[in-house]
From Swiss-Prot:
The keyword Metal-binding does not apply. It comes from Staphylococcus aureus (strain NCTC 8325 / PS 47). Keywords: Isomerase, tRNA processing. NCBIfam families: hisT_truA. It comes from the Bacteria. Homodimer. InterPro entries: PsdUridine_synth_cat_dom_sf, PsdUridine_synth_TruA, PsdUridine_synth_TruA_a/b_dom, PsdUridine_synth_TruA_C, TruA/RsuA/RluB/E/F_N. It is an enzyme of class 5 (isomerase). This is tRNA pseudouridine synthase A.
Length: 267
């Protein structure tokens, strides 16, 4: 039987989602829990592999089990033993050919920034602090330039190992908040550090160090050295996973291009 689990977690005290040789990860917490239940190793398969310090409001993984536990009890059984910085929101059965990664057709990230004269210790790890005044309108105009299908070679980590760095963004916008702004981006998939590089670039635009008109040129150059900054992980949230293409079409229109993850790698 294949089970799909929806979870949320605060990333401050994790080295990321994926198992690391030394260190605490989200995958490690769940596989340790499932091993106790099954008396054997059970591998989980996530929709996304968040990095160290990145939070998730909605994340999914699936695993296979032979245990005859009522579906209504899985959530309780997991939450009673999980640490306080992880929570299981829902557990359902899925078809045996369902795959959490390959059936994912889109993801949405939100990057949270607060602006003030002084750093707020109560925001530490949850939002990124920027004391400078930024031109949010200009930043939003630059953000809109990323919507569509582009080669994001110049806007991801040089450690990205995948062959194709072409991704499609359905949404890319700056939204003003009471204490700063959020950057919201939805796409077919994301390269390693791509969202954080986009945020860092948009902040440079807000400071007047780049222009809106620079975006097409930087995309065309495919040179990471032209965008050398990466925003901190602490303000980044994996906000939504699209497992249903109809939901994606509902949010962004029937004309968008749907990508299947069997042709994409990374993120």
């Amino acid at each position: 039987m294949r089970i799909l689990v929806e979870i949320a977690y605060q990333g401050n005290n994790f080295l990321g989602f994926q198992i690391q040789q030394n260190g605490r990860t989200v995958q490690q917490q769940f596989e340790k829990l499932l091993q106790r239940m099954h008396k054997r190793h059970v591998r989980i398969h996530p929709s996304s592999r968040t990095d160290r310090g990145v939070h998730a409001i909605q994340q999914y993984f699936h695993f296979d089990t032979e245990l005859n536990i009522p579906m209504s009890q899985w959530q309780y059984a997991m939450n009673r033993t999980l640490p306080d910085d992880i929570y299981v929101n829902n557990v359902v059965t899925v078809d045996d050919d369902f795959h959490c990664r390959y059936d994912c057709v889109g993801k949405r990230y939100r990057y949270k920034v607060y602006q003030a004269q002084h750093r707020d210790p109560f925001q530490s790890g949850l939002k990124t602090f920027i004391p400078e005044t930024l031109d949010l309108g200009k930043m939003n105009r630059a953000a809109q330039q990323f919507i569509g299908t582009h080669d994001f070679t110049g806007f991801c980590s040089q450690k990205t190992e995948v062959e194709s760095k072409v991704r499609t963004l359905y949404q890319s916008e700056i939204v003003k908040t009471d204490d700063g702004f959020d950057y919201i981006v939805t796409g077919s998939g994301f390269l390693y550090n791509m969202v954080r590089v986009l945020v860092a670039f948009l902040i440079e635009v807000g400071k007047g160090r780049h222009e809106v008109s620079d975006v097409p040129k930087l995309l065309e150059s495919k040179n990471r050295k032209n965008v050398p900054f990466t925003a901190p992980a602490e303000g980044l949230y994996l906000e939504k996973i699209y497992l249903d293409e109809n939901e994606l079409l509902k949010d962004f229109g029937n004309d968008i291009k749907i990508h299947r993850k069997k042709s994409l790698q990374n993120d």
